[in-house]
Amino acid sequence: MSSELMFNYTFSWPAGPKDVILTGTFDDWRGTLPLVKTAKGNFEITMPVKLANKDDTFQFKFIVDGVWCVSDSYKKEHVSEGIENNFLQITDLVETQEVAGASRIPEAGGLLCGKPPRSAGPPSTSNRKKNKRNNKKRRSKLKKKSTKNNKKSNESLDDNEEEDGVTGTTTEDVTGTSREETPLAEPTNVSKEAPGNFHILPIDQSADTTXSNGIIGGPGPVLVPNPGEIKEFTEIRDVDARELNERLNKKEEVPEPVAGPIVESSVTEKSPALPQADDPIVETKEVAHNVQELTPQVEAVTPLINEPEPLPTPEAQISIPESSKVEPVEGSLQSKLVEKRESTEGVLDGSKKVENKAKKDEEVFTLDPIVNKAPKLPLTDEQTAEGRKSPAVSEEKEKKKKQEKGSKEVKRSETSKEKKPSAKEVKKQTVKASKKQTASPLSSSTEEPKKKKTGFFGKLKKLFK
């Protein structure tokens, strides 16, 4: 046991300044303990004071608004020249130990939180008497309100009231005033506890309360019972960031498409559509025979045109088998062409005949697959007659145009006659002109151009004469 003595003491300073700080030997004169301002306006603080022995003293001082001061309410001593401090002895500390059992706040420098509560005991007799009086008043009110029909209920109530009277309380107040329900607190011996030693409750760290304590205090560290079995605690991997990035980037790269191989694939896909050399050529022999038969006929029809014989192509080879069916049509076409020449010799020139023959022969006897088209029909006698009568029709049209022009001129003349002024209007105009001449002889020079303007009607008369 150490021989140090500890007491709780309250330091105070009267109201007036803004800030008051307590300093002394307890903090090596650093001014670290500010006083708390109370509702009254003064400053107070309660803190534990330690003394090494009975003869030791506790030296302190106040810093009021930044100025070091000494209080007159405490004892003073001169330490050196010009330096004065307040001090406390053991006798001063013992006198203030009436509140030694009060609970204190260590974080606030030992400030008192309140006086110790009164030890629990049986309820006072005065409260019990008050409860009985109130119960009697309630009973009298219930009896006045009851009627004859409720006698049975009143009897049961009286029985219950008698039972309550034996115990001294009613059923309503049993829970609040019964001695059995109020637990007796264990008596605490305050004198045994040393002043300044705070009472700390024991902590129950059983297995049942460990989980709840973690939740109350917040999420704490998790202690696993079998850390050796978990792979994450034992396995450690060393990964190079550069190698990992290179490997991932290589996988992400996609080769760009090349234009060459794609074109070759499209050509190879289309190539089967062309005729192959392995196929049997059965129709070509017949086609060649038919072409030889057609060539002399073409020469007989078109002797003026000397064209080279067309070579057989795959398209011609496919379409030539149908030419055998068209041969009789070609003979009829030749006869019709001769008739057309005889009917149109007087109208068309010789040069146009040759050109038309060449065009028609080419259209009819070409080896293209358009041979199946319907042939052009020859012109009839009526159509040729209409072609010959075309000059007469044009003369009739010209006559009609001349007649229409003459009718338009007649209409214009009629409208001009309607616009001619009457004899009365002419007289009025002459009278007005004479008046103007008599009124202003100097205006003769100005009237000459006006006469020219009125000569328009004279011109119209000359035209109709």
UniProtKB/Swiss-Prot annotation:
The modification Phosphothreonine is found at T182, T295, T366. One of its GO terms (biological process) is signal transduction. Residues 107-227, 247-276, 298-465 are annotated as: Disordered. InterPro entries: AMPK1_CBM, CRP1_MDG1_kinase, Ig-like_fold, Ig_E-set. Residues 166-177 have a biased composition (Low complexity). One of its GO terms (cellular component) is cytoplasm. The keyword Cell division does not apply. Residues 160-161 are annotated as: X-DNA-binding. The modification Phosphoserine is found at S153, S156, S271, S319, S343, S394, S440. Residues 156-165 have a biased composition (Acidic residues). Belongs to the CRP1/MDG1 family. This is Cruciform DNA-recognizing protein 1. It comes from Saccharomyces cerevisiae (strain VIN 13). The lineage of its organism: Eukaryota, Fungi, Dikarya, Ascomycota, Saccharomycotina. The gene is CRP1.
